[in-house]
Curated annotation (Swiss-Prot):
It comes from Arabidopsis thaliana (Mouse-ear cress). Pfam families: Glyco_hydro_32C, Glyco_hydro_32N. This is Beta-fructofuranosidase, insoluble isoenzyme CWINV6. SMART domains: Glyco_32. Belongs to the glycosyl hydrolase 32 family. Its EC number is 3.2.1.80. Expressed in seedlings and leaves, and, to a lower extent, in flowers and seeds. Keywords: Apoplast, Cell wall, Glycoprotein, Glycosidase, Hydrolase, Secreted, Signal.
Length: 550
């Protein structure tokens, strides 16, 4: 019986493996590192344990893949492996910088021979004429930065991409935590030559109660349009974003930065609460962004962890994947970022279905989206709501806790909803991941909550099943509610209202796999909603590291 159960798990694991998300063929993946474009190829490096599907503090290397469209990838030899006293215990995360002469340089974190102290290391390509950048060398002058006295030896890591100030000096941030406190910080270093680095007297930003800041990012965003700008651009037409990964989330602040005074005036501080702005409200961490000079856009990648058991990961033989690459830009309000899958993802669309006529969903209605491969799909749907009136008898949202608001089975306090999509659902709906909206009263108006519930995502045990949610910055009286979901067997990326809010869910259905998976539109609210448009596509497989060249 045990052998049969294990065989069933392995068969399910094969069908749970994604078909157009980035992941290695086997073993462990975590943080995305040093994405860049160089001589005709996009490069993505990543944290990799080549020996097992688990994290290791002593054998992490840099995996390396290249692509011409950020959709199909070829796996190359590892770029960085532990080899010197300054990184002999692991090559941890870092970033790439393109120097003025066009040469790429990597700054990364080495765990040195001295009690695995975290230090910053420079790596350079051995042959800059090689567009694939297959070989990297580590100059003998390394390491170039070591933990300052007020930072623990193991809380100093993940250098950002460097940028140039008006004085011509290079700047870079290192994620850190203050010794004996929970104050997280981004430590600023400056250099004339990318070799000798000097710590600035005060951090660029710090916040109490957040703990260690991992994988920081710092970059300008245009306030005049959607196009991205180079990381060193700093003028009146941009504001700056500082992102830090802590508490299991990727949070960011927006502010104005001056390289003359090294002052970053953020609109708010990190709080390590739900009040922090997040790239993604689901399973998403340790992201890394870069400026794509080919199409003048800023692209962001995030790591999606497994939420099953370590035992299951060993049986599968793999763990960890990346989100789809997302374009990011400033919302017209200037207060938050927008995100959307890069346009190249659309090239995977094949068979499609659509519904142009309006369709009313009364309470309890369910509508199957048939004619596509529901386990591997891209779907966009738009809803409109009948006229909303101010009704003092409706419960104000401030009286409803988040757990209730994000609960797929609760309509407490809702004017409309829950309504939305049931993805990776079984035919009897015993398995389903619900991506839905609720419209609630708040003050003198209304607010919209977007959620993704994994409570019924799988009949399997030993799987973390969470409910994620966030408020959408729209007024449902004047704007339609739209949703795009990219479904890939065991991951669902959901984008609300053009990318105002994003939620990634990692799920492992037992029944809703392969051809047995279903996709539905539903409305469980007390009031009817109108679906004004629906488009859905089957997605073809991408070539993801299936043809390693070594």
């Amino acid at each position: 019986m045990a052998d049969v159960m294990e065989q069933n798990l392995l068969q399910t694991a094969v069908l749970n493996r994604t078909s157009f998300h980035f992941q290695p063929q086997r073993n462990w993946l975590n943080d995305p590192n040093a994405p860049m474009y160089y001589k005709g190829f996009y490069h993505l490096f990543y944290q990799n344990n080549p020996l097992a599907p688990e994290f290791s503090r002593t054998r992490i290397i840099w995996g390396h893949s290249v692509s011409q469209d950020m959709v199909n990838w070829i796996q190359l030899e590892p770029a960085l492996v532990p080899s010197e006293s300054f990184d002999i215990n692991s090559c941890w995360s870092g970033s790439a910088t393109i120097l003025p002469d066009g040469r790429p340089v990597i700054l990364y974190t080495g765990l040195d021979v001295n009690n695995k102290q975290q230090v910053t290391v420079v790596a350079e390509p051995k042959d800059v004429s090689d567009p694939l950048l297959r070989e990297w060398v580590k100059p003998k002058y390394n390491p170039v930065m070591v933990p300052p006295s007020n930072v623990p030896f193991n809380c100093f890591r993940d250098p950002t991409e460097a940028w140039k100030g008006q004085d011509g000096k290079w700047r870079v941030l290192i994620g850190a935590k203050e010794k004996d406190t929970e104050k997280g910080m981004a430590i600023l270093y400056r250099s004339d030559d990318f070799v000798q680095w000097t710590k600035y007297p005060v951090p660029l930003l710090e916040s109490e109660g957040t703990g260690m800041w991992e994988c920081p990012d710092f970059f300008p965003v245009s306030i005049t349009g959607k196009e991205g700008v180079d990381t060193s651009v700093n003028n009146a037409s941009v504001r700056h974003v500082l992102k830090a990964s802590f508490g299991g989330n990727d949070c960011y602040v927006i502010g104005k930065y001056s390289s003359e005074t090294e002052d970053f005036s953020a609109d708010y501080e990190f709080t390590n609460t739900s009040a922090d702005l997040r790239y993604d409200h689901g399973t998403f961490y340790a992201s890394k962004a870069f400026f794509d000079s080919v199409k003048n856009r800023r692209i962001n990648w995030g790591w999606v962890i497994e939420t099953d058991s370590k035992e299951d990961d060993f049986k599968k033989g793999w763990a960890g994947l990346m989100t789809l690459p997302r374009e990011i830009w400033m919302d017209t309000s200037g207060k938050k970022l927008m995100q959307w899958p890069i346009e190249e993802i659309n090239n995977l669309r094949t068979k499609s279905v659509s519904l142009d006529d309006c369709y009313e969903f009364k309470t309890g209605s369910t509508f199957e989206i048939s004619g596509i491969t529901a386990a591997q799909a891209d779907v966009e749907v738009t809803f409109n709501l009948p006229f909303l009136e101010n009704n003092p008898e409706i419960l104000d949202a401030d009286q409803v806790d988040d757990a209730t608001l994000f609960d797929r089975d609760s309509s407490v306090g809702c004017v409309y909803g829950p309504f939305g999509l049931l993805a990776l659902a079984s035919s009897d709906l015993s398995e389903q991941t619900a991506i839905f909206f609720k419209v609630i009263r708040r003050g003198n108006g209304y607010a919209v909550v977007m959620c993704s519930s994994e409570k019924r995502s799988s009949l399997r045990d030993n799987i973390k099943k969470s409910s994620h949610g966030a408020f959408l910055d729209i007024d449902p009286r004047h704007e339609k509610i739209s949703l795009r979901c990219l479904i890939d067997h065991s991951i669902i990326e959901s984008y609300g209202v053009g990318g105002k809010t994003v939620i990634t869910s990692r799920v492992y259905p037992k029944l809703a796999i392969g051809e047995a998976a279903k996709l539905y539109v539903f409305n469980d609210g007390e009031n009817g909603v109108i679906m004004t448009s629906l488009e859905a596509w089957s997605m073809r497989n991408a070539q993801i590291n299936s043809n390693p060249t070594y």
